[in-house]
Amino acid sequence: MSDTSADPHDVNRGFFFSHVGWLMMKKHPDVIAAGKKIDMSDIINDPVARFHVKYFTILKVMCCFLLPTVIMVYTWHESWAIAILIQCFVRYLLNLHFTWAVNSFAHLWGVTPYDRNVKPKENWGVSIVAMGEGWHNFHHTFPWDYKAAELSYFINPTTLIIDAFALIGWAYDRKIASTNLIEAVTKNRGEKICK
């Protein structure tokens, strides 16, 4: 459903729409219809997810704005004005755009080494600012692979976090695409980048 009318961030509607414009409009009827087909029962029944939904607003205010600002004032001895400016505006705004870049930049610019027939690309810049989430051609070619890339932790820190959670039992049943499958798909459908 990527890059179709059922995709809430459809890049075919332009860069602005896929980056941030989708937040300013009503959802396309195909997005709503596709969303109703998704089985969310495992998440709805998860006590941690329910806690997060129930307390989202207070957690966001505390963890996203209050704690970073207070830490900056009391540990770095920064003024309240600068701390609020940096933490509540600059950092937050940058993080929003880094997140949105996954649906815009990583669908428009980059290479398609795994499947040249899909729009999502491998984009180094997005991967750097979005903790490894810019390896979008791999992610859309092998959507069940929890790593969303073949690369090391340095370039994909999200995988490092998931693997750390697996060590303490918070993540389990991690699925990966086999090396043989990746090689076969790349050979048949990937963009020929190197000669």
Role assignments for model-derived ranges:
Residues 1-4, 23, 102-116, 127-146:
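Histidine-centered catalytic micro-motifs
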Residues 1-100, 135, 145-195:
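Non-catalytic, topology-defining segments of multipass membrane proteins
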Residues 47-58, 108-121:
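Interhelical loop and helix-boundary elements at the membrane-water interface
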